[in-house]
């Protein structure tokens, strides 16, 4: 019984340590967002300059493109332990993309499709 509990706690600790909060400067740069492998791609720039009213960082690029999936155009973004949140002007989260790997963030849509945010390659 004691060994089972030790294994459980050990697993919980390793899972928690995999949630690393990256800084805005780590994530700043050019990114693309697209649904599945569709040809339409939104080109975004995650900037590390703060947007105080949104409690996040400046989001640049073609943010209007995101309104095909979001109820309003995002103004900012913020890193989270689980991934990247896209924010409206007042700071509410419009979308949370979960980290899948280095430079790869995803969210499952209600219709079964998937939105993929990837760091753009130079």
Task: For every predicted segment, state its role.
Residues 16-30, 69-72:
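N-terminal helix-cap/turn-to-beta initiation motif at the start of protein domains
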Residues 33-78, 93-96, 104-113:
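N-terminal glycine/threonine-rich, aromatic-flanked beta-hairpin/loop signature
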């Amino acid at each position: 019984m004691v060994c089972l509990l030790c294994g459980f706690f050990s697993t919980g600790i390793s899972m928690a340590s995999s949630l690393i909060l990256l800084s805005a400067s780590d994530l700043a740069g050019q990114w693309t967002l697209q649904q599945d492998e569709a040809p339409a791609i939104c080109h975004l720039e995650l900037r590390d300059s703060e947007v105080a009213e949104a409690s996040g960082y400046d989001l640049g690029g073609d943010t209007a493109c995101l309104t095909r999936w979001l109820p309003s155009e995002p103004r900012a973004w913020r890193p989270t332990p689980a991934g990247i949140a896209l924010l409206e002007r007042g700071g509410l989260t419009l979308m949370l993309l979960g980290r899948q790997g280095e430079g790869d963030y995803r969210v499952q849509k209600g219709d079964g499709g998937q939105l993929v945010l990837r760091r753009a390659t130079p």
